[in-house]
Amino acid sequence: MSAQTGSAAAIGDKGKGKSAAEPQDVTMGEGGDDSSSEEEVDDDAPPPAEEVEEEASDNEIDKSNIIQGRRTRGKQIDFAAAAKDLPADDDEDEDDDFQSEGEEDDEMGGN
């Protein structure tokens, strides 16, 4: 009978419903009360909220960049008149290497 109770105890320890083992206290190195680990800073961590607020307050908005009264909503814009005020584009320089579909390409022609 002792063989049966031994195997029953082994089966009872196995299986579902087993509670988790007690957590063990694991300390790294000597003297777990070192404050050096608390002083180490993670380079990828975001800065504390206090520093972020200081940086944001240092960057003031330049008032000269704010445009007053330049709303265009609902206004009729004459694009033809606006185009006359702009200087002409120098498109001739950009068209030098353009070839239309009708032209043959000597470099790629197989025959």
Curated annotation (Swiss-Prot):
Residues 31-59, 88-111 have a biased composition (Acidic residues). Keywords: Chaperone, Nucleus. Coiled coil: none annotated. One of its GO terms (cellular component) is nucleus. It comes from the Eukaryota. It is found in: Nucleus. The keyword Magnesium does not apply. Residues 1-111 are annotated as: Disordered. InterPro entries: Histone_chaperone_domain_CHZ (IPR019098). Pfam families: CHZ. SMART domains: CHZ. Forms a heterotrimer with H2A.Z-H2B, stabilizing the association of the histone dimer. Also, with a lower affinity, forms a heterotrimer with H2A-H2B. Forms a chaperone-bound H2A.Z-H2B complex that acts as a source for SWR1 complex-dependent H2A to H2A.Z histone replacement in chromatin. Belongs to the CHZ1 family. This is Histone H2A.Z-specific chaperone chz1.
